[in-house]
Regions:
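Extracellular and secretory-pathway beta-repeat/beta-biased strand scaffolds
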Residues: 1-149
């Protein structure tokens, strides 16, 4: 596709809850990918995410586009909540990446991240672009919150 917009709590996700491996998410949008905002009805943030909550390995998120924009709490991530290994996040944006803003109702920061909140190892975060903008509370992050690597 040329343009992909995920808005108002919309999500693309690949999850694993047990011992099996999670699937991968590949996004190819020649012009732009936008991940924007929160839905007060569902309480969800707009997100492209691969996550594992069990012992299985999480999938990867690979985005190829001209411009990636994550605003008002929107984000792209791979996260581990279990003992499995996290997937990798790779963003190839030929023009620019912009990450900015905090969604005021949920206080969710816009983010590009790979992280672990349990015993599993986090994956890597790779960003390739000509112009990177991080502003107004936006965050690019790799982190370990618990005993993971």
């Amino acid at each position: 596709t040329r343009r992909l917009a995920i808005e108002d709590g919309g999500q693309i996700s690949a999850s694993t809850f047990g011992a099996g491996s999670g699937g991968n998410i590949f996004v190819n949008a020649s012009e732009s990918v936008q991940v924007l905002g929160f839905s007060p009805v569902t309480g969800r943030i707009a997100m492209i995410s691969a996550r594992t909550t069990g012992s299985g390995s999480g999938g990867n998120v690979i985005i190829s586009t001209g411009r990636l924009t994550a605003l008002n709490g929107g984000g792209v991530n791979a996260v581990v909540f279990g003992s499995g290994s996290g997937g990798d996040v790779t963003v190839n944006a030929s023009e620019s990446i912009e990450v900015g803003g905090i969604e005021p109702r949920s206080l969710q920061m816009s983010v590009l991240s790979s992280s672990t909140a349990n015993a599993g190892a986090a994956g890597s975060l790779t960003i390739n672009t000509r112009r990177l903008i991080v502003r107004d509370g936006g965050r690019i992050d790799t982190s370990t919150v618990a005993s993971g690597a």
